[in-house]
């Protein structure tokens, strides 16, 4: 009986050891999965604060409301990624692609080849959004990973897409003004309101 008890104990110990090793492989092994991170302050001209929360995996820009006017052709966006699995001592390639609708597809430019540096589990990359070709229309695209060309596998499902939207729209409300202000002040110098006049004034004030 004593020998049987020892055998059972050893079998249980081996089972526990195997399950622990299997767990560690899942948690820290060679899975090398990639996920998007979101910047809590994205679009607010502040230092990035990266979050895993999916609520921050989006970015919207209005090219119409900017002091550069029509000369602003692209908008720069910082995209953060986080890697699960063990860190490695060599750079690993990340390739993005977009999933966009058939109409009003936002054009996204990738100005460089992207790599996650060695010995790190996070990286930040720069992408460019092109100004929409048509005014007063919302353009959109989902940024995702090209897994076939990247050195990573897909991570958490809900963190595999980063939503992008852009428009080129101007009206009094978006400019931060209102009809009474225009009629009571700007109309004395520029006459009746028009979008063209508002776009000009945005570049001056």
Predicted regions and their residues:
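Acidic/polar, low-complexity intrinsically disordered N-terminal segments immediately downstream
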Residues: 21-103, 173-205
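Short beta-strand and strand-turn-strand segments in soluble, beta-rich domains
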Residues: 99-115
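Short proline/glycine- and polar residue-rich coil/turn motifs
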Residues: 114-122
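Short glycine/proline/serine/threonine-rich loop/turn segments at secondary-structure transition edges
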Residues: 133-140
């Amino acid at each position: 009986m004593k020998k049987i008890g020892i055998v059972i104990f050893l079998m249980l110990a081996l089972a526990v050891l195997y399950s622990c090793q299997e767990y560690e492989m899942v948690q820290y092994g060679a899975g090398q999965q990639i996920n998007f991170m979101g910047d809590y302050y994205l679009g607010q001209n502040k230092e990035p604060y990266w979050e895993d929360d999916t609520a921050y995996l989006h970015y919207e820009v209005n090219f119409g409301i900017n002091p550069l006017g029509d000369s602003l052709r692209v908008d720069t966006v910082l995209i953060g990624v986080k890697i699960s699995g063990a860190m490695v001592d060599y750079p690993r390639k990340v390739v993005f692609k977009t999933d966009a609708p058939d109409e009003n597809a936002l054009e996204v430019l990738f100005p460089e080849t992207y790599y996650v540096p060695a010995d790190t589990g996070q990286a930040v990359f720069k992408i460019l959004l092109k100004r929409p070709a048509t005014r007063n229309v919302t353009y959109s695209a989902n940024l995702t990973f090209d897994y076939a060309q990247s050195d990573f596998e897909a991570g958490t499902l809900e963190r595999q897409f980063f939503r992008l939207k852009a428009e080129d729209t101007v009206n009094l409300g978006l400019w931060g003004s209102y009809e009474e202000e225009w009629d009571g002040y700007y109309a004395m110098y520029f006459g009746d309101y028009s979008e063209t006049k508002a776009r000009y004034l945005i570049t001056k004030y």
